[in-house]
Amino acid sequence: MSQGIITKVSGPLVVAEGLPEAKMFDVVKVGNQGLIGEIIEIRGERVSIQVYEETSGLGPGDPVVSTGEPLSVELGPGMLEGIFDGIQRPLDVIEKKVGSFITRGIDVPSLNREKKWKFTPKVKSGDKVSGGDIIGTVQETVIVEHRIMVPPAISGIVEDIREGEYTVTEPIARIKTDSGQIVEITMMQKWPVRKARPYKEKLPPEIPMPTGQRVIDTLFPVTKGGTACIPGPFGSGKTVVQHQLAKWADAEIVVYIGCGERGNEMTDVLLEFPELKDPKTEEPLMKRTVLIANTSNMPVAAREASIYTGITIAEYFRDMGYSVALMADSTSRWAEALREMSGRLEEMPGEEGYPAYLARRLAEFYERAGRVICLGSDNREGALTVVGAVSPPGGDLSEPVTQATLRVVKVFWALDSELAYARHFPAINWLTSYSLYSDVVEDYMNKNVSSDWGELRSEAMRLLQEEASLQEIVRLVGIDVLSTRDRLVLEVARSIREDFLHQNAFHEVDTYSSMEKQYRMLKLIMIFYQEAQKALEKGVPFSEIEKHPVREKIARAKYVEESKLTVFDEIEKEIKKAMQGLIEGGAADA
């Protein structure tokens, strides 16, 4: 370990000299308290260090010690149900040790060193293994089996492996490598956060990831291994959408990064997730969740690390063959941390003061998503889906972070303040949002849910777009100038908006809709549209169609429980019968 001295302190940036062996991104201990920092620039003898803790009290002449290792995370049993800060320090352990506030320079191991885990081998002595092979399992929580893998760079023959209870640092197996060296394998691996974990092959993202949110799954779907962003102004519901995705997305593991957002939002997650039951296993959602809390009152520099910490943990679970969803809330705060450090380094600023390399850093982050064939001889498949929230100041989508994000992500869920103020949630604007996965998902849904899924979706989108142009006419000259056909379009589009797209996150039934239920709900509205068109052609007055009691049943369909979807067949019959009754009644009057 080489030691240098501080020559300058500027907020979270510390400049030091006397570290000749220092390398980029090495972790250093700064000052007498041993604050954790990372080398982010080397110019001759001078190294610039980004410190992940409050730097008040540091001054020139204080010592700086380099560890010679990059910023790494500990990967092994004990991460699930955990809540960590941006550099993977467990907050519950810190709270027991020093109370409610994190003491500067506190050094606690990320994974519990005392707890013993029951290890069950999957290979035996004499077997040949290579990087990524699963050599055994640990039942980490009731619903997640933690698969212990050979580290990526190691291959050879298993010399010794035993079942039993071990801590994460005790050897569970010994492998004789091809060069004859004996390597001891523990349940814990260390991995540098800025380096993507390796895989065999990247696959196209073709399988949809149902989220239970109708506007997302039907109109703007995301796939397993896909990338999505949620930009929106303050108060438009970004965090609630992220929470909904974390709760109901069809992923086996969820990593939730609270990066620079309010502390009470992380508190909500901590209070809600243990109470909520996973629809597939009926166990608390917390049993499959890792939380990274790096709230707005924590040091700015640690926000940058938190995003990388989160995605490295997510990649590790992906390598086991799991489908992982990563929520980053919000990447704007991360970009602001980059801007602050760039300013302190006196770099040439780009647009709005952000560094010129902002787009590259964002692309590097989102490119770590994907559906892959993992390392290992069993060719297992894993997927990592990344959803990043963006908080543009004033909801201005032309600002650099949003624009750089849009260049790399494939799904854009644009949150609209007008919809939010009108209490339409989720406030995803159906006219400006898009998904580049919709064609792939359409093929999948046509095969697996119903052959007319694609037609229904296209028709719904057409009606919503037609409604937008008709509303302009209505605003200018009033609704009376519209033909009855146009008035029907407005009425059906309103039904799509209010009865289908609008969803109550806090209602026990409406909070989640399966793909089957979404299809049945949309089909009801479209059957009503087709039957109402026939009734209009037969001369039935529009007012009678508009006021018919069957409309109420369509509106209440969202509250039908998943176990009672046969109710939709009855409502379909009622709609056809009601419209037929209107036609026959009109014919009798004539």
UniProtKB/Swiss-Prot annotation:
Catalytic activity of the protein: ATP + H2O + 4 H(+)(in) = ADP + phosphate + 5 H(+)(out)
UniProt-annotated binding residues for ATP: 232-239
EC number: 7.1.2.2
SMART domains to which the protein is assigned, alphabetical: AAA
Gene Ontology biological-process entries: proton motive force-driven plasma membrane ATP synthesis
Keywords: ATP synthesis, ATP-binding, Hydrogen ion transport, Ion transport, Nucleotide-binding, Translocase, Transport
Top-level EC class as recorded in UniProt: translocase
SUPFAM superfamilies for the chain: C-terminal domain of alpha and beta subunits of F1 ATP synthase, N-terminal domain of alpha and beta subunits of F1 ATP synthase, P-loop containing nucleoside triphosphate hydrolases
GO cellular component, one term: proton-transporting two-sector ATPase complex, catalytic domain
The keyword Ion transport is assigned to this record: yes
Source superkingdom: Bacteria
Presence of keyword Translocase: yes
GO molecular function per UniProt: ATP binding; ATP hydrolysis activity; proton-transporting ATP synthase activity, rotational mechanism; proton-transporting ATPase activity, rotational mechanism
InterPro entries given in the database record: AAA+_ATPase, ATP-synt_VA_C, ATP-synth_a_Xtn, ATP_synth_asu-like_sf, ATP_synth_asu_arc, ATPase_a/bsu_AS, ATPase_F1/V1/A1_a/bsu_N, ATPase_F1/V1/A1_a/bsu_N_sf
Family membership noted in the UniProt record: Belongs to the ATPase alpha/beta chains family.
Function: Produces ATP from ADP in the presence of a proton gradient across the membrane. The V-type alpha chain is a catalytic subunit.
Protein name per Swiss-Prot or TrEMBL: V-type ATP synthase alpha chain
Organism: Thermoanaerobacter sp. (strain X514)
